[in-house]
Amino acid sequence: MTLEPRQAAPGALRRWILAALQLLWRGAGVWLALSLLMCLWIFVGHRLPLLSAMLALSALLGSILIAAQVDRSPRIRLADTLTMLRVHAPVTLRFSALITIAGAIIWVVLLAKPGVAWWNIFYTSRNALDILSPDGFVALRQIFVYSAFALGLCYFGLNIPGLTSIFQFPCMTLLGLPYRDALRLGAAGQIRNLNSVLAIGALFVVLPVLFGLLLPVLVPVLYCFFGALTYVAFREIFLGVSENRPRESAEARVAATPLSSCA
């Protein structure tokens, strides 16, 4: 079977945003709880940049998988979600580690300011926080600003030329392709939909800044949203499915239970 990425129909970004928000609403409880937990861990480990990057990437990639699960299942359960994430954990962690290491090398070689020690990628007290502000809103901003900043950088990590593509991870996990094949296929889909992908990139840059400053408590929602947005874009480009699958009716769910089948 040969997969050929499609060019999305006009109005793709608006369609993807609406579909992503619908998936987010359907799976909000468990999904948001896991995202919030990851954001809090990013805050706890904010002195360790590599760890924070790994956590942020894992949270975003995990959200892509959860979005696929929400789309396919009438109801999302914590046990099922954790099982699914555990199955894909090796690929998720390897891909996150690859991006983190590549990003660290790029920072050391090209982006580090003069006089900044290279080992700051492992541990830094710069911009570290010891005491939270007594003001509740400011304290929330202090907590979630690190995960907001990390989320904004994730887009660039997912688009390292010759190494990663924004659709590569779902190609590996949801289509079962090996790394190189997923990279080539993901890059082809990205090129065919360059304007829409660049618009997604603009959202990756702008929304974390706005939410980090104005709505910090909703930063975990952004991880879920961008995971869902990436998934629905992937789904339309590579699978030709532009709309979310409808939820099963309550009657169908009841009919599928063991009790109803024994009656």
Give the ranges of each region predicted by the language model.
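Hydrophobic alpha-helical membrane segments
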Residues: M1-A263
